[in-house]
């Protein structure tokens, strides 16, 4: 169930972030990504606490990405990590390049 839930969210050409609304790093990640000109429907924040499977989802994220912490940011089908990884990519210009590469931004 958790595996199915996560796998159906992760899609090429889309950015998906698994979050918990009370997490300050999740809020920072949302703030960073929400400032970018995404094409409609290509940025999704998934609140894992809205399901009854929060622990199972985090266990599957651990299996999939090597970490069960949130946020877990997927650019296309690739997990780039969490908030600090996103900040690092933003600072070195890699974030915009990757988002353009998957066609997620309005140019």
Curated annotation (Swiss-Prot):
Residues 3-106 form the Glutaredoxin domain. Disulfide bonds join 23-26, 79-83. Gene3D superfamilies: Glutaredoxin (3.40.30.10). CDD domains: GRX_GRXh_1_2_like (cd03419). The modification N6-succinyllysine is found at residue 9. One of its GO terms (cellular component) is cytoplasm. GO terms for biological process: cellular response to estradiol stimulus; cellular response to glucose stimulus; negative regulation of hydrogen peroxide-mediated programmed cell death; negative regulation of platelet-derived growth factor receptor-beta signaling pathway; ovulation cycle process; positive regulation of cell adhesion molecule production; positive regulation of exocytosis; positive regulation of insulin secretion. The modification N-acetylalanine is found at residue 2. GO terms for molecular function: glutathione disulfide oxidoreductase activity; sodium channel regulator activity. It is found in: Cytoplasm. Has a glutathione-disulfide oxidoreductase activity in the presence of NADPH and glutathione reductase. Reduces low molecular weight disulfides and proteins. Belongs to the glutaredoxin family. This is Glutaredoxin-1. The gene is Glrx.
